[in-house]
């Protein structure tokens, strides 16, 4: 993100502030999405946080700088913070716990590959077009598609299990004598 800001003439200090805001927003996104997932339908929670990211990317694509660019950074960070939480929660609801490890591992692997590809595409886009606008437009389009797909998810296939584990037995410690 810092490269996007400095490319647009933003000072190094403000670019560093944007990075700090992303970090703060990651925490808010992680905690906030986790809390909301306990009370609301997960695709709606994901739409809320990923919609914020889409808005932030669109603001950056529109060439916002100064305070709006800092707000855009925060919005992008919110979705970044919610990604793993919403992914794990929805996998458990739509694929169940029996296949959770496999499904989550595959999804997380794809998530990591997409993150690496995004960085490469951003760099390639800048090298080819001498601007971050084309890759940002592509990312905005991908986010809109993701939001549309999330809005089409139906009811959970697997509910919450309410199994209660028995209390642990006290451990007897020998005196060693």
Residue ranges and their predicted role:
Residues 94-129:
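A late C-terminal transmembrane helix in Major Facilitator Superfamily
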Residues 134-152:
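Symmetry-related core transmembrane helices of the 12-TM Major Facilitator Superfamily/SLC fold
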Residues 38-50:
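Cytoplasmic membrane-interface "Motif A"-like loop-to-helix N-cap segments
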Residues 52-64:
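C-terminal ends and interior cores of transmembrane alpha-helices
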Residues 67-75:
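Paired small-residue
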Residues 29-41, 126-127:
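Helix-to-loop junctions at the C-terminal end of transmembrane segments
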Residues 1-13:
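Short amphipathic helix-loop junctions that connect adjacent transmembrane helices
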Residues 82-95:
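Intracellular juxtamembrane helix-capping segments at the cytosolic ends
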